[in-house]
């Protein structure tokens, strides 16, 4: 069983083996997370060449060979090369240096899987089949994108402010948990989905006041 985890990668080193379309997708997500990315591949897609030229990624223009991961000491390694032998060698070296590895074509060789995801600001939903069927994960993600539009990310920003205001009033974490359980219900989700953020926030604020008075 895989352990679900949201990982802070800002400023952390990650290495991608291979320079094709799969690598391009992995690298795009890593850069968005603030990772420092090295790609090892004899050739790159046009987009990755642009990233290398602009110094957004470091490019080692060679087919992977043992010893190439030691210099960068990555925390994560993604093996996406077309050469299965090179991928296998990279998996072995990644484990030897203590890095976690994802082998795109061989889920059983992977230490972790990258789920399909919906990302609106701090609002993040992920779907995974453990590498069993990426296509099914994408299908589920597409359905969830319709059910959870950008308004959910916008509402999370409001909830952060309300939560901080509640903390500033004091009362302790246990009391706050009781209050949040009382004010959060399906109606809030329906309002946010409909884009009625002001009304949803108003209901939350009224609920917080009422729940606080009862506690």
PLM segments and residue spans:
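Residue-level detector of alpha-helix initiation sites
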Residues: 21-22, 84-85, 131
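Hydrophobic beta-strand scaffold residues
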Residues: 37, 59, 100-101
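ADP-ribose/adenylate-binding Rossmann-like module
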Residues: 76-82, 87-114
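An accessory alpha-helical subdomain
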Residues: 131-215
